[in-house]
Swiss-Prot record:
Organism: Rickettsia felis (strain ATCC VR-1525 / URRWXCal2) (Rickettsia azadi)
Cellular component, GO annotation: cytosol
Protein name stated in the entry: UPF0246 protein RF_0769
InterPro entries xref list: YaaA
Gene Ontology terms: biological process: response to hydroperoxide
Family statement: Belongs to the UPF0246 family.
Length: 248
């Protein structure tokens, strides 16, 4: 089983992770291609295409300009935000981290797909950003889908578990994916209606990755046995390809 999650805008490069050795990212040449485009933009252009403040545009202009000399950190330690905070990566053992290294991919606008211990540098590039007519979803789709197929070919349980947002999971081409895609949904029962509450769903995605790591889970079936921040599996609302977890 291979799990995908979205990268985060929030980064934490202040504290370094000392318990792991960094690995090399999967698509360095394609990352460099995007970097060349990003380095050609002025601060005003970055502010416009990324829809960010001039202050953030200045920070990212400086990052891209001197990218190779920026500090590196393992991806799973470098990202912050609701998903990553609930993985509780700082509490994972080396054995659990090594398990995630072969069972988790972090989807990124700049790096495409990252193994948890792949080295990354500080950056900002959301998957929905357009660079000189480059659609990042299209740019990455074939490469990432082919890579996932190759990885799952070596797995005993050949499932792709989708814990990424719509914007990021769209880099997987379902028509070219050779194996079963399983989507995860976290919903809340509010006055008899099932709704997805974005921030709570993000936290639950992180909690599920934590459970996968703690229990070395390699099958979607086993995920049904655990609660995730109050969300519990609902057989009534689920199918083989859509697993629904509900908080009452």
């Amino acid at each position: 089983m291979l799990v995908i999650i979205s990268s985060a805008k929030t980064l934490n490069f202040e504290k370094l992770a000392l318990k792991t050795e960094l690995t090399t990212s999967i698509f360095p040449n394609l990352t460099n291609q995007l970097l060349s485009t990003l380095q050609s933009y002025s601060e005003n252009q970055l502010s416009e295409i990324m829809n960010i403040s001039t202050k953030l545009a200045h920070i990212n202009k400086e990052r891209f300009k001197d990218f190779n000399n920026q500090e590196s950190k393992a991806a799973i330690f470098a990202y912050a935000g609701d998903v990553f905070n609930n993985i509780h990566v700082e509490k994972l053992t080396n054995h659990e981290l090594n398990f995630l290294q072969s069972h988790l991919l972090i989807i990124s606008g700049l790096y495409g797909a990252l193994k948890p211990l792949d080295a990354i540098k500080p950056y900002r590039l959301e998957m929905t950003t357009k660079l000189n007519e480059i659609n990042l979803t299209s740019f990455w789709q074939d490469e990432i889908t082919d890579y996932i197929n190759k990885v799952l070919a070596k797995h005993e349980n050949k499932y792709l578990l989708n814990l990424a947002s719509q914007e990021y999971s769209s880099v997987v081409n379902p028509n070219k994916l050779k194996y079963q895609l399983v989507n995860i949904h976290f919903k809340e029962n509010r006055d008899g209606k099932l709704s997805t509450i974005g921030i709570n769903a993000k936290k639950a995605r992180g909690a599920m990755v934590n459970v996968i790591a703690n229990n070395l889970i390699d099958s979607p079936e086993l995920l049904k046995n655990f609660p995730y921040l109050g969300y519990e599996f609902s057989p009534k609302h689920s199918s083989d390809s859509e697993l629904v977890f509900i908080k009452e």
